[in-house]
Amino acid sequence: KHRPSRQARPGKSSFFRLLAVKDEWFSDDLRRLDDDNVYRKLQGHWIIEMSEMIATANAKSIEEIKSFLSKQKETYKVPYETHPADRLRQCVFAGTTNRQDFLPRDRTGNRRFIPIPVDAELAEVHILDNEEDSRAYIDQLWAEAMTIYNSGNYKLAFSPAMQETLQAHQQDFMQEDAQ
């Protein structure tokens, strides 16, 4: 599992909210990974924004972060239900931050994080300029993604060369070692 992490100024949350297509499929309410209600907060949402990477910053360890991000299902009891039930994850996580050094130091690698620097100055059109146009553009993006998916001509894993490039890129976003 990989989690894109966008770096930019205004518009980060709006981008992911619009990318979710319907506002109710987006949530930015994840503050702690050990919250008793964390799994209920995931249900019904397609994109979960970890604003300013707060949830990962509040985590006790990198292992807690990796375990949380890697789960494919949750088992918990909803109030008034008799027994816990398995619920498959149907969401992706997107971390946003204005900091450059947001990736945790992980001796096993940070394969769960894909930093995507965004320079709003280079954008031809800013996502906040016109929400209707932005939604139309994102609808087109999803239509093209669906065409690629239906063609079967895609890979869900990075090639070794791409993994090597990503690892080098991630170094630019690593937290400095504490002295």
Where are these regions (language model features)?
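Structural recognition of the conserved hydrophobic beta-strand(s) that form the central parallel beta-sheet
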Residues: 48-51, 77-78, 90-98, 115-116
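P-loop NTPase catalytic core of nucleic-acid-dependent motor ATPases
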Residues: 1-44
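DNA transaction DNA-binding modules
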Residues: 156-179
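AAA+/SF3 P-loop NTPase mechanochemical coupling elements
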Residues: 38-43, 78-96
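Short glycine-/polar-rich loops that comprise or flank the Walker A/P-loop
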Residues: 44-46, 72, 89-92, 108-114
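A short helix-turn-beta junction within AAA+ P-loop NTPase domains corresponding to the substrate/partner-engaging
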Residues: 103-124
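Conserved catalytic/switch belt of AAA+ P-loop NTPases
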Residues: 62-85
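Conserved AAA+/SF3 P-loop NTPase catalytic/coupling segment centered on the Walker-B
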Residues: 46-69, 103-109
